[in-house]
């Protein structure tokens, strides 16, 4: 199997330069949503347990002076994702990255021209058209900003961009047989979003291992973006009474900016 190159929120300059080589590496982009440096043990947060990231960091180059540019609206992850995919600065994006015009070439498009198969699973908080330009395959895709991690409405990749399908749902069968239609082709109720996207990524890698074509795999997690919810096995790793809170922590935001009841960060 071709050598895998894992990239986490870094510049693609080294990737593009490597395409001239005879043997093109497979590329895996793993993107965590709204994850801060303070959430990683190897960056000095000793009370946080991140053994896998610590091991990866020990074998990698870590860009400790790289910072996100933020956003000009309430969203930070959406423009950050668009900047990463296009190489554009914040103020050169269109609509904060909610749409990515044809003139903004994405990394997936560049890799396709170099002979790569491109696959995405996970969050894509941008347009359908941009997704289909950047990738030619995909499964378990979430179009949106935030959602219940245990009940994620998902779509598989559609070359014709037919992402308008809705799921029939009866919310209260005891009181009514009324059918409502909600976003998403399907849903794995009770399965955490991290497990869903990881499964699809592993399945894709297994399918590609005997193929000669190099691949670009994008795995975009919805976590740790709020709402804060995680499997109990990870909650049990910590004694909540011993967690040290930062000096600027507040139980509740002092004023309502219009999102007080839907955000927990």
What name fits each language-model region?
Residues 15-17:
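N-terminal signal peptide c-region/cleavage motif recognized by signal peptidases
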Residues 2-4, 9, 19-265:
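Formylglycine-dependent sulfatase
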């Amino acid at each position: 199997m071709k050598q895998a190159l894992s990239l986490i929120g870094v510049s693609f300059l080294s990737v593009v330069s490597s395409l001239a080589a005879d043997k093109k590496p497979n590329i895996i982009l793993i993107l965590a949503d709204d994850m801060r440096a303070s959430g990683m043990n190897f960056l000095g947060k000793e009370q946080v347990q991140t053994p896998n990231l610590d091991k990866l960091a020990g074998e990698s180059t870590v860009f400790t002076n790289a910072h996100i540019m933020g956003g000009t609206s309430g969203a930070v992850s959406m423009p950050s994702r668009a900047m990463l995919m296009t190489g554009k600065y914040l103020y050169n994006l269109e609509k904060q990255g909610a749409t990515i015009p044809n003139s903004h070439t994405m990394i997936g498009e560049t890799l396709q021209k170099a002979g790569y198969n491109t696959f995405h699973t996970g969050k894509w908080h941008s347009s359908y058209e941009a997704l289909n330009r950047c990738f030619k395959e995909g499964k378990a895709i979430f179009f949106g900003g935030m959602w219940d991690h245990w009940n994620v409405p998902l779509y598989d990749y559609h070359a014709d961009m037919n992402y308008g399908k809705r799921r029939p749902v009866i919310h209260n069968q005891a009181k009514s047989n009324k059918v409502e239609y909600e976003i998403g082709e399907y849903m794995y109720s009770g399965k955490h979003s991290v497990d869903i996207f990881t499964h699809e990524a592993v399945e894709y890698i297994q399918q590609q291992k005997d193929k000669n074509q190099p691949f670009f795999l994008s795995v975009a997690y919805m976590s740790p973006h709020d709402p804060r919810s995680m499997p109990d096995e990870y909650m049990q790793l910590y004694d909540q009474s011993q967690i040290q809170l930062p000096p600027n922590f507040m139980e509740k935001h002092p004023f309502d900016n219009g999102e007080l009841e839907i955000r927990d960060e």
